[in-house]
Amino acid sequence: MQWLSVCSLLVLLSVLSRSQAQNQICTIFTEAKEDGFKSLILVGLAQNLPDSTLGDLVPLIAEALAMGVKCCSDTPPEDCERDVADLFQSAVCSSETLVEKNDLKMCCEKTAAERTHCFVDHKAKIPRDLSLKAELPAADQCEDFKKDHKAFVGRFIFKFSKSNPMLPPHVVLAIAKGYGEVLTTCCGEAEAQTCFDTKKATFQHAIAKRVAELKSLCIVHKKYGDRVVKAKKLVQYSQKMPQASFQEMAGMVDKIVATVAPCCSGDMVTCMKERKTLVDEVCADESVLSRAAGLSACCKEDAVHRGSCVEAMKPDPKPDGLSEHYDVHADIAAVCQTFTKTPDVAMGKLVYEISVRHPESSQQVILRFAKEAEQALLQCCDMEDHAECVKTALAGSDIDKKITDETDYYKKMCAAEAAVSDDNFEKSMMVYYTRIMPQASFDQLHMVSETVHDVLHACCKDEPGHFVLPCAEEKLTDAIDATCDDYDPSSINPHIAHCCNQSYSMRRHCILAIQPDTEFTPPELDASSFHMGPELCTKDSKDLLLSGKKLLYGVVRHKTTITEDHLKTISTKYHTMKDKCCAAEDQAACFTEEAPKLVSESAELVKV
């Protein structure tokens, strides 16, 4: 491959600031160091050329590495200074093999911005898969890992990048780093397989969580625009860095929001440039760093991992002298004056003041209060007696009470989750969501009930006490965002469609207020609706849970107002049948006889 081609591939993931207009390759080569440099190239190649093999890419990476060295020489080639997106596309399009193998002919017939959009759209259509498919036994993985650590991690990056073309490269590399840490720990254990199975499940959960957060942010940006994203990020980072001033935080949030559109579109060149600019500027502000311990620690990370570190920061201690509560009424004259001239600034200041005082709150609780406060200010600030008007308008709205009430709600959910087995709690969620949206498919409701269980299980376990609220509501809101985006809400029912079109912070409350759908016309409840046979005698808990949930789904759809007592009766009969037939000599014959009886008895119960 010619130098132009090598250079193009190399700078696909150039993470340089706009001010570094010259010799971009040398700067990233210096900052990321050789291994980080090669990893970034690998992610970019794998994400954009999914039908190429690792063998196809290895020579390109080696040549690109050599080009990086030349770009840092005393006489760097002119190609080091060219536009990165144009270079990458030109290089790929000059290779008939790459174009044909990765179906890029249509894109390569375009030029300039049209070609860039085509490349981004092409990547967006590549199927995604979050699973870790390297299902070799731990012993084999450990042998490969110990034999050549870098090669093993490289193969992981290649496979994961191909399956997740829209994930920002820094996220892919953070995931690869985590997977390497799992192997480093487990390969030194006597029971490597047990260690690996346990840690892999935890690691997979962490991946799903991070991807859900990124997906939700993109969905929110697409549906609600910059204003809501800015409000979310202002809450998030004000909670993390309460020592920073409102002006400092507002400036930082503006830069964060500027990265969302390119990162969500799949334009990773611009995404990484914007992120690099953001992190560089934030980490260069010694005034903020001296007061924000978490940020200061993250800024000591290498260029590849700083951004992920900042996103994962825990809240710093609150500044000395900060009042426990924020009273919007105490300075209402100044608030109204600012609101009249620049309403977004006034609302940003209010959100900031609440957020720095309440790291135990979710973003949604603060935004719900802010929405009420905004309505009060709109109504009152032009009035002569605006102070009294605002007091009256917000008389029933208290942020501290909202936080307490929501925290108590999740604590009760945690208690309910702890009081029963994991399977029974998941089944109860299946019942709840089938009642309010019986039109949804089993697969949809299975996913929803599983997600709610996973969120509460993780948050109740990992975030005890008052921090359960931001953990649980953030994750459940992410799940709602994904559900409303992945499926046509109007195809489920008008109530769900209405809630999906509510304001961002009100979606979950809206769904919780939905009553069982009594207008749904269910299919006939008969034996053909269920398949219950010897497969129920398996010891696989997942298969058993799935079977139990399918029965509940069918029964509750038939009567969304069925009582809990009737459900318990049906569940008892189901387990009695299962125990009887699994103990029978001819299991199939037993199920053939008993399953229709169970369905018939269940049908009679739902008529009551």
Swiss-Prot record:
Signal peptide positions (record): 1-14
Keywords per UniProt: Disulfide bond, Glycoprotein, Lipid-binding, Metal-binding, Repeat, Secreted, Signal
Entry coiled-coil feature ranges: none
Glycosylation sites (chain numbering): N501
Main location group: secreted
GO molecular function: lipid binding; metal ion binding
GO cellular component: blood microparticle; cytoplasm
Location in the cell: Secreted
Albumin domain span: 19-205, 206-398, 402-600
Residue numbers covered by the propeptide annotation in the UniProt entry: 15-18
SUPFAM superfamilies, sorted: Serum albumin-like
Tissue distribution: Plasma.
PANTHER family the record matches: AFAMIN, SERUM ALBUMIN-RELATED
Purpose: Binds water, Ca(2+), Na(+), K(+), fatty acids, hormones, bilirubin and drugs. Its main function is the regulation of the colloidal osmotic pressure of blood.
Family: Belongs to the ALB/AFP/VDB family.
Name assigned to this protein: Albumin 2
Species name: Salmo salar (Atlantic salmon)
